Each structure stands twice: as C-alpha cells, then as structure tokens.
C-alpha cells in the first residue's frame, strides 16, 4: 500500500507539471497574434500562384501550425527597377504587417532588385528568405542583416572542390578566378576550409599558383604562360560563362585542354559553348526549381514561428515605413530562429550557417562529353546516416581530356630532379677531390654543396649505401638527377617562429627537410628517419631499411696495472692475510717456548738438547706453509704448536685455492660485453654524474625523446650533452669521454662491426625506418615506393646491407677475438716480476749490508786477536821465566836433599781446551802429579825426559822406577805438546799456581 501511494503521488506531481506547462503555453499563445501575413516578391505568376497554394496547404499541417494560428499570403511582382521594388515593398507588404518576405528573381535580371528588398526589409528587421540569389554579397550580415537563402552561394562550391580533390588524390592545384567579389570569396573559402578539412583526410592539396583575372576578358594568353611553367596540371576555375569561353579558347591554343590536364569548373563556366571534352563541373540540384524552394522557405518560416510562439511573445510586425517602426525586436529574434532550422524539404536537407546561407545543398558532378553533352558521373549529397555531406563519383564513367579513361596524374612529372644527401657513414661517404683530380671514381658521384657560391664546392665525391640505391633507383624509374650535399650538414628540425602579425607560432624547418618543404629540392636520398613530425610536411616512400634506436658504448675493460695479480683479493683481505701470517708465527713461537715439551734431548746421545723454535724460525715456518714451500728445519716441537701449524696449513690451502680461482676469473675469463642493459636501465633513467649519454640535437632521435613523456627526465639531462654530428659523438665514445651514445641502430651496428672495442647495448626501441623524402604531393612518390618494394623482393637491399653495413671480415675477426680465451701478458703480470725483482734487489742489498758488517766485524776481531796474541806472548814469557826459576829452585832443592819430595798438587797444569779438547778432557784441573806414567810423559817437555830407558830426573827415590819406552818409536813427535802446555802454563794467568 505504501508503494502504491508513492506511485500515486508521483503521477499526481507529473500531471500537475504538464498542466502548468500547457497553461503557460496557452497564456503565451494567447498573447501572440493568431494571424501571420507572409509576403512574397516573386518573379512570375506561376511562382505567385504556387506561393499562395503552399500557404493554404500549410494552414492544414498541424505539425508546423499551432491551433488557432492562420497564415495569409501577400505577394507582389519583382520589378527590374530596384527603386520601384522598394516602394512596392513599403506600400503593399509592410503596410499589411508581413512577418517575413520570400524573394525570387530571374537569373538574367541581376541582383539589384533582390538587394533592394533585402535593404528595405532589413532596415525594419523583417526576415527575408531568398530562393534564387547566390551572390557572395548577400552573405555580408553588415549589409544584409536579415537575409537568408535556400540556395548556397557560388563560393560554397569550394567545399565540393576539396571533396573532389580528395577523391582523386590530387595534391597540387592551380586556382583561376575572377577579381570580383564572388571570385575572391571562392578563393578565400578554399584556403580557409582546406586548413580544417585536411585534418580528417590523408591527402592534402596545396595551391601552387593563383591566377586572378579581370571580368570581361578579351585574352587569357599571358596567364597561360605562367600556368604552363607550373608543375600542377589540375585547374580549379571560377568564371562567368563569357569569361570561361575566352579562357577555354586560349587554353586550347596552348594545348592545355588535352591529355594530362584536369579542369574542374563552377556552374557558370560549365555552360560555356566551347567547354572542352573531359571537363568536370558542378551543378546545383534543384537550382531552377522555384516551386521547391518556395515550399521549403515557407515551411522553414512556419517551423521557426511555431517554436518562437511556444517560447516567447511575438510582437506585431511594422505597419509602415515610418520611423516609429524601426526597432522590431521580434523580427531580430525570429531571424535567429530561422537560422537554427534544419528540416527535410523538397530540395533536400535545409539548414543554414551563421551567415544565413544554405548548407547541405546537393550537387551533381557533370562530365562534358562530345558535342557539349553533360553527363552526370557523381553526386555530392547529404548522408542521413552520417549526418554529413558525402561525395560519390563513378570513376569508370568519366572521360578525361584527350578522351582518356585513365585518370591523369594531375601534375607534370619532371624527369630531372634535384637530389640532396648528407654525409653519414656507411650510407654516404664524402671525399674531397684532390688538386690533380678531375672526376670521381666509377662507384662515386659528384656531390657539391647545395647552393654553394664557392668554386671549390664542386670538389666532392660521394659513395655508399644511399648512392648505390640512388643509382639503381634512377635506372628503374627513369629519371636523371643532380646530387648535392646538405648546405648546413643537418637533417633538419623545426623552429617555432612568430610571423609578422600572426597570433600563433608556425614551424619553420631547417636542413634537408627545409630545402624540401620550401621546394628548393625534389628528393632526399639519405638515412632519413620516418617520423610523424616530418611526415606532416613532406612525403616519404616506403622504408628502404627498417631500423630502430639503440645505444653505443665502449666495451668495459679492466685496467691492467702493475698490481693486477692482487686483484683477486680486496685490499682488506690482503692486509688480513699479512697480519695473520705474523700473528700465527708469534703464537707458534709462544706455544713452543712455554710448552714443557718444547725442548728435549735425544736419548742415548752425547749431544746437547735440541734448541726450541725461535721467533725468526716461526715466521719462516708460517710463510713457508702459506707459500707452499718445503720446510726443512725450524718446525714446532710441542704438540700444541703443531696443532696450530696444521690449522694454519689448512687455512693456507683455502687461501691459495681461492686466489688461484679468482685470478683466473679476473685475468683470463671473458669480460662482460656491456655495462648498460638498455634504454630502461635505471642508470639512464636516473642519470648519475659519472654516466653521460647524448644524441644529435635536432635529429629524429631527439624528436623521439621529446615525444616520449616517460623519457622526459632523461631527455632534460642529456639535452645539454647533445652533439652537432654523430661522428663527433662516436669519437668521444671511443675516447671514453662519452659513456652512451643514443642513435640509429644501422649506424651504430656498423660502428660496432668495424671496431671490436665498441658494442651496442640492449634491445632496439623506437622502431622506424629510413625512407626517401619527397615534396608533399610529389608525382614520384608512388613510383619510388614501388621500386623500393621490388628492391626488397629481389634481394638488392640485402646486398647493400652486406656490402656497406655488415663488414663480414671485420665482424668475423671480432667474433674470433671474443671467443679466444684471454691470455695473461706482461701487462697483467708485470707486478709479479717486479715483486721478484724487489726480492732480488732486497737480497742483494742485504748481502751487501752483511758483507760490510762482516768486514767491520773481521777488522775488530783482528785487532782483538793481535791484542790477545801480544798478551799471550807476554804471559808466555812470564810463565817461562817462572818455570825456569821454579825448575832451578827444584834443582837446588834436589841437590840439597835427595830425599825431599814435592807434593804433586803443587804444580798446576793448564790445558788449552780449544786446541786440544781431548787432552783437556783427560787432563782436567782435578788431576795432578803423580798420575799415570803415560800421561806424565805425554805432557812433559823433551828436555825434561831422560834418555830412553832412564827414569825422569824429578822422580824421587821412594817412588818406583818405571822404564820408559822410546818416544820416537812409541809416541810420534807431533803428539808432543807445545811449550805452553807444559806444567805451570795456562792461558789465564789467574789459574797459574806454582
């Protein structure tokens, strides 16, 4: 129930709104007049009768006439005298309060009378609808303020011309027009409309020549001379019937109406009695149907009044030509309602532009045949589905001038062309001729600087990929050429400049493109990249080589320094290894020094105990293990030190193995080819200070970076680094001044194949192609394109690639260079040899120091030996004297008392252990006389011994006598001790005891 109540309330609300609207409409309608007089100024009685009949029928058409509204007609006959016409309008139409006036006139009577009606009615703001006036003057709303017409003006035929040119693909035309208002209007309409029209189509027509003539011609010969020298053979002509006869007559005499020429004329010229066969013209549909236009004008008026009644109050029309009725505001608003009408009438779709001129008017395309027969070959009419005008032409039915069925090219095709090129290896090589040269080589072509005034400009020869292509192209499509170099050495880019008096900036091209745009050259044969900016102003053939953009860089190389052999380890690791060697050596020494088992004595041996590991031996051991050298002596003795030694040996094995592996990786293995991964490399997108990239300023690559929004940051960075030419940039890449050069892939691949140190990085991006540039609308475009396609199919382009771009032998050598393992040379290992040299020099230096030190030590030792010898000699002398005195004293004692006996221990025996160690051991200081007889004899001097078989003199009587053997037989003479080893002698005087 709630839902039903909601619906009921909405229905009640809607009904109330409708009733209120109807009430408001009834109120408005009640304030508006119920009768409307429509005036007619017509050319004949039939038109007057048809006008009255149409209004009567209108009153019964509820679609256009509201209830209680009635239309009445008020007509007068159009008078040839415009002044009389003005009076008739005031007396017979305005006095009857006409709300609008429909005007027609005879085509032969001129436009003065319709203009008089327009002036008079416009002065009182009464709308006027013309059905036959087509002059351009009626479009001027400053004069004809309230004039509309159901027929288009003559100059609207320019719109149809553009459609026809687009249909036939003509790109260059000559416009012929009279110097009157309509002639200049059609030229202005063509130029204005073409600027917006060609935004929606691919083919753009340009005006090569404009020929303006004074009406009422007597001769057109002078203009024909200029037309004949022009390139275009398509003529768009606006002329009256009389002037067209003169033009066709003179053009026929110059053979400009025959084969190869195209004439497209307006309606008036189509009716000349000498129109040549093959001429195409336009004819307005329903142009002479006054009845149809009368009906359409009446219904347009009724439609406007009906809408105005529903929206506002219409004031009464002026009643007389007095001053009191000058400002009729309702008439001005009614004129605006009329301009907004769009209905389907008897003459087609009826609508108006801001000037009140008919739009959507249909035309027939007429082809003149033999005996001036007019044959309709097409229509320009309104398409209801697309809600716009559409051109339909049956090309097969057209007979062109010269009775040709094939469409003319519309242009005079020159067979001798001005061809421009530019130095760009390997596509174009430029060589200056020597002083003794007079011609180029067979594979070269002369190529002077374009428009150069210097006499030396002709001393250049060109060869290369593009030159071979040009030679073959000229043979294939049969043309001759003059080859020249770019005047400024640039491909060309546009500069925005402000023309005098212009509100907007216009593009002005430089370089090769500028020469082509300004029509100073016919063709560009060079590595010219196809891009949208250039294609807007020049024509391109199909690409003769497909390519893209890539990055050129120098292959990364490790710098081979004197310490290259140290590269496998970082500096930190080397320092740690050096420190570890000495730390381990120190710990080994300490472990061996303080271990209770660090020193021991060999069992069953008279030798001293083996010495412990000292610090120098520990260092020697640590280095020996690390360097994998044999250790002969100085090894640890304790178990703890030996455990550390084994761990150190394992450490040394790992370090040496790692060093060996990394040394191979650093010095022998293949180096990486590139440093950059491509255009998406983060180092390029966020350019760092140590990474510079650039391209050629004003080039197609430069334009590409300008277009790409995602590369804007990168472009702003590289813009300051851009070069004037690609050659300069490539040289800087080789020198290492530029890290990345971004350019066309064809050129960079060529450079990389020529120099093994250069390489292209990443994949191609910005793919495009090289094309041959021609003028916009050039007749050679299709022929050049077809020839290039044939070259691709026949393999000719592939042959040029192999010959000029991919140098097979150079590339093969680069591949062999890359595949061959890198070998270590002196540059890599020089540091090792220097290290050996330093070791040798250090050893020599140390031995010199040792020799010098030893000499100093020997000199010191000699001085000590001399002093010791002198002391020994002095001591010997003293001891000898003491010995003699002692002997004499003993002899005296012996002589005094034979029974006196000396204690054996009173005489000391000094032995030189250094010279006679064995004797020193057996005759130690603890042994004294008497002793072993043999020992006594061995130490006595010869003069103290008796003769063989006798006892010594020193023996007492109480002592047993022992026979002595012959010394000469039992003891060799050399075993006799020297005098200083006699009893009582010692080298140390302090030990001498007598």
UniProtKB/Swiss-Prot annotation:
Stretches in topological domain Extracellular: 24-570, 670-828
InterPro entries from the UniProt entry: ANF_lig-bd_rcpt, CaM-bd_C0_NMDA_rcpt_NR1, Glu/Gly-bd, Iono_Glu_rcpt_met, Ionotropic_Glu_rcpt, Iontro_rcpt_C, NMDA1-like_ligand-bd, NMDA1-like_N
Compositionally biased residues, Polar residues: 984-994
The organism's place on the tree of life at top rank: Eukaryota
UniProt key word Transmembrane: yes
Record-level GO BP terms: calcium ion homeostasis; chemical synaptic transmission; ionotropic glutamate receptor signaling pathway; long-term memory; olfactory learning; regulation of membrane potential
Sugar-modified residues: 255, 311, 342, 394, 451, 478, 498, 690
Keywords: Calcium, Cell membrane, Disulfide bond, Glycoprotein, Ion channel, Ion transport, Ligand-gated ion channel, Magnesium, Membrane, Phosphoprotein, Postsynaptic cell membrane, Receptor, Signal, Synapse, Transmembrane, Transmembrane helix, Transport
Transmembrane segments: 571-591, 649-669, 829-849
Primary location group: membrane
Membrane topology: Multi-pass membrane protein
Annotated positions binding glycine: 527-529, 534, 700, 744
Parts of the chain on the Cytoplasmic side: 592-648, 850-994
Annotated localization: Cell membrane; Postsynaptic cell membrane; Postsynaptic density
Family, as annotated: Belongs to the glutamate-gated ion channel (TC 1.A.10.1) family.
Subunit and interaction comment: Forms a heteromeric NMDA channel with Nmdar2.
Protein name: Glutamate [NMDA] receptor subunit 1
Phylogenetic lineage: Eukaryota, Metazoa, Ecdysozoa, Arthropoda, Hexapoda
Gene that this polypeptide is encoded by: Nmdar1
């Amino acid at each position: 129930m709630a839902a039903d109540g909601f619906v009921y309330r909405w229905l009640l609300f809607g009904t109330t709104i409708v009733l209120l609207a109807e009430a408001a409409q009834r109120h408005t309608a009640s304030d508006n007049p119920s009768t409307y007089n429509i005036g007619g100024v017509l050319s004949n009685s039939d038109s007057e009768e048809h006008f009255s009949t149409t209004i009567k029928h209108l009153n019964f058409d509820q679609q256009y006439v509201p209830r209680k509204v009635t239309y009445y007609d008020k007509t007068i006959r159009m008078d040839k005298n415009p002044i009389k016409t003005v009076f008739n309008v005031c007396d017979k139409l305005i006095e009857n309060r006409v709300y609008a006036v429909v005007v027609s006139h005879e085509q032969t009577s001129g436009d003065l009378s319709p203009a008089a009606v327009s002036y008079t009615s416009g002065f009182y703001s009464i709308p006027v609808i013309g059905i036959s006036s087509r002059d351009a003057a009626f479009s001027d709303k400053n004069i004809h303020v309230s004039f509309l017409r159901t027929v288009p003006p003559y100059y609207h035929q320019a719109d149809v011309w553009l459609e026809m040119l687009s249909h036939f693909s003509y790109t260059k035309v000559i416009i012929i027009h009279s110097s009157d208002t309509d002639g200049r209007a059609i030229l202005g309409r063509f130029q204005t409309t073409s600027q917006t029209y060609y935004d929606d189509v691919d083919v753009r027509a340009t005006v090569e020549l404009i020929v303006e003539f004074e009406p009422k011609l007597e001769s057109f010969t002078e203009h024909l001379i200029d037309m004949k020298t022009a390139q275009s053979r398509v003529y768009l002509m606006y002329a009256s019937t009389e002037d067209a006869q003169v033009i066709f007559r003179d053009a026929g005499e110059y053979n400009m109406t025959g084969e190869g020429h195209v004439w497209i004329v307006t309606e008036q010229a189509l009716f000349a009695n000498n129109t040549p066969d093959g001429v195409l013209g336009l004819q307005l549909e329903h142009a002479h149907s006054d009845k149809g236009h009368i009906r359409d004008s009446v219904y347009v008026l009724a439609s406007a009044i009906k809408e105005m009644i529903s929206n506002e109050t219409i004031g009464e029309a002026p009643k007389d030509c007095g001053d009191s009725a000058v400002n009729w505001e309702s008439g001005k608003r009614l004129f605006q309602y009329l301009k907004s009408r769009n209905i389907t009438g008897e003459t087609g779709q009826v609508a108006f532009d801001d000037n009140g001129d008919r739009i959507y008017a249909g035309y027939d395309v007429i082809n003149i045949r033999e005996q001036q027969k007019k044959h309709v070959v097409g229509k320009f009419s309104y398409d209801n589905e697309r809600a716009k005008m559409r051109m339909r032409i049956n090309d097969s039915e057209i007979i062109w001038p010269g009775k040709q069925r094939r469409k003319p090219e519309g242009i005079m095709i020159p067979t001798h062309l001005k061809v421009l090129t530019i130095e760009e290896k390997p596509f174009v090589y430029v060589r200056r001729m020597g002083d003794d040269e007079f011609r180029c080589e067979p594979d070269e072509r002369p190529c002077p600087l374009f428009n150069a005034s210097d006499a030396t400009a002709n001393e250049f020869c060109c060869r290369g990929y593009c030159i071979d292509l040009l030679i073959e192209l000229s043979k294939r499509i049969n043309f001759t050429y003059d080859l020249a170099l770019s005047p400024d050495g640039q491909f060309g880019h546009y500069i925005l400049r402000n023309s005098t008096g212009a509100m907007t900036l216009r593009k002005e091209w430089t370089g090769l493109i500028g020469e082509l745009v300004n029509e100073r050259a016919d063709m560009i044969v060079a590595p010219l990249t196809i891009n949208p900016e250039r294609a807007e102003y020049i024509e391109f053939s199909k690409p003769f080589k497909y390519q893209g953009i890539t990055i050129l860089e120098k292959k990364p190389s490790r710098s081979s320094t004197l310490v290259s052999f140290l590269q496998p380890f970082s500096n930190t690791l080397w320092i740690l290894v050096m420190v570890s060697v000495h730390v381990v050596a120190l710990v080994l020494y300490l472990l061996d020094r303080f271990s209770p088992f660090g020193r021991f004595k060999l069992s069953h041996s008279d030798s001293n105990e083996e010495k412990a590991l000292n610090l120098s031996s520990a260092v020697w051991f640590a280095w020996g293990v690390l360097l994998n050298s044999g250790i002969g002596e100085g090894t640890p003795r304790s178990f703890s030190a030996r455990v550390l030694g084994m761990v150190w040996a394992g450490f040394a094995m790992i370090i040496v193995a790692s060093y060996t592996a990394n040394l191979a990786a650093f010095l022998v293995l293949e180096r990486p080819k590139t440093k950059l991964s491509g255009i998406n490399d983060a180092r390029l997108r966020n350019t760092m200070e140590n990474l510079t990239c650039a391209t050629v300023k004003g080039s197609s690559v430069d334009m590409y970076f300008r277009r790409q929004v995602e590369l804007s940051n990168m472009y702003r960075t590289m813009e300051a680094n851009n070069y004037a030419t690609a050659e300069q940039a490539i040289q800087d890449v080789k020198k290492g001044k530029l890290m990345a050069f971004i350019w066309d892939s064809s050129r960079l691949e060529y450079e990389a194949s020529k120099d093994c140190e250069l390489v292209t990085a990443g994949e191609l991006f910005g793919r495009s192609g090289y094309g041959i540039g021609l003028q916009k609308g050039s007749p050679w475009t299709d022929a050049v394109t077809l020839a290039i396609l044939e070259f691709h199919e026949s393999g000719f382009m592939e042959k040029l690639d192999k010959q000029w771009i991919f140098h097979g032998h150079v590339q093969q050598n680069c591949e062999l260079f890359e595949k061959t393992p890198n070998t270590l040379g002196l540059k890599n290992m020089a540091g090792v040899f220097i290290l050996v040299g330093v070791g040798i020099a250090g050893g020599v230096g140390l031995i010199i120091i040792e020799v010098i030190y030893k000499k100093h030590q020997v000199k010191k030792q000699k001085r000590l030996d001399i002093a010791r010898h002198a002391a020994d000699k002095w001591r010997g002398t003293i001891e000898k004297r003491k010995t003699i005195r002692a002997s004499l004293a003993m002899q005296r004692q012996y002589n005094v008392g034979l029974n006196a006996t000396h204690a054996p221990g009173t005489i000391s025996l000094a032995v030189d252990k250094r010279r006679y160690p064995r004797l020193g051991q057996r005759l130690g200081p603890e042994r004294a006389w008497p002793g072993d007889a043999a020992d006594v004899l061995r130490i006595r001097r010869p003069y103290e011994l008796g003769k063989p078989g006798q006892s010594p003199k020193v023996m007492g009587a109480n002592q047993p006598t022992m026979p002595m053997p012959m010394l000469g037989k039992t003891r060799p003479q050399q075993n006799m001790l020297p005098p200083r080893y006699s009893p009582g002698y010692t080298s140390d005087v302090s030990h001498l005891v007598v």
